[in-house]
């Protein structure tokens, strides 16, 4: 009898438990278009983003896929979601959580240009409909996924309308108090995951699933910090310091250093940050970042001056390779200089990369894992010579720790360092079919194709590809606080001065935007002398760029060139000339930052008077008469001219030109022009119309 009663009770308990279990299952409705549906994915039932989200969430959740290919958010769009069968099914599902990803198809010219004013209204109405069937439901609005530049309508409106729709979604979230999740940023650096320019493949869908999973659960993988947070790190002194990272939602985070203790809580997107009070220069701080579950303590932390050193092979050129390199390396003992050396895993030399290398490069995993190191003969030997000499002169002058981050890549193009949004908006033509695009230097394209010869992917990624090094080498720095940037690049863009002129401005302004510092110092090296015909014009374009871009300075290197070698070995003067710009312009030291820089030329009685900046003590570098000046009445027909120093000005004349209209100096690919100032700093070559 007792056994029968026990069995009955167990049966009744089991019967009662089933509905309890069912009501505890959390229903997630994934509402959207073909991206939610899984168009283009071979096995969408297993690999669409909702299917992968189900795997991540587990049995406590029930995920429904209510994606409709071609659906628009707009009620007057060409295929309104609210008129589709999937919409009614989503309502009937009555999700506890509703993830909405709509808006991609609204970029169609049939939709956004005509009905943009209805977008916010229609989105709010859609949200209300889900709230009506489940008043307690949690609404997650997704920023729309990227559309790659390969899309046929990209430049005819799609790119601009895509941005406008993102802003409209933000407005909807503000009004409705819905949560915003970002389906755009995680996919944006990976256009190869969008084979048809719109639909993510399985891997792309996994990124969306992971994004939704973290937003739903608050699980962001625990405490994570930027790659630059290591022992021996250098923090920028004398300025409020942003220390940041990610952690699981609502996790308390405590940051401590030098008696400061700042506390915060990770937000719903897993992000946290604190602002430390300015720290004075020093070299033995301890930085602690803690959550209740995890702790990171960084030892031997310094506070001083932090500079990013970037560009191509002449910035990458190692200290041990330079003139007198062995002596310089043996003397490179300085714990006040710290190096963060970002080396590529594979050299961009004349070889075919293995398939595993190509796969890593496709995933932006080009750089080796590294950490901050004190400057020693061992750590400095393979470090950038230009950066080392720059940092050494700064440290000798400022007497504070100096941190140097170097991510230069040999042969890299200017466009590879420019952010994707800038190129999409202001120079989209350079993105198109980049390995066959003559905006990009033929040598760079040929070398990239050789490295990628074993690739089976239709879309190829490489450090010379537009945007690549920005995405692989700048974004991972996560806006680490810097004082400024030094740059040595241009050899791989000298074939097209006009394109570089546009690209360089995009690069400088884009990097300043990334660091939220419109006045960030940016000092760069003018190309040296070499027997390449286009370099005369290119050097002058660099000079003009310096005049147009504020807070920049240009180190002249033409006197240190090699007529046959693109990699001159005398790097010390170049690094020190960059340091002069920093010491004068950034740290306000009273030293000449540069050699004579052309200001203007005025015609007077068939003679030309040239004025310069930084013209103190003008003379010739070799004791001989000045050489390299030419005059012309008609552009293209120049004659050598005599030049005489008159105080801080130069008088130029020739009997062969009676009415001079144009002047140029040092106008040879490999120039022996010899004008310098009192500090033996060479004048930049130039060309201009005479006033």
Feature annotation, model-predicted:
Residues 227, 236-240, 570-573, 580, ...:
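Surface beta-strand/loop "capping" patches
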Residues 244-327:
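Extended acidic/polar, glycine-enriched regions
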Residues 340, 347-382, 483-492:
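Short, conserved helix/loop micro-motifs enriched in His/Cys and acidic residues
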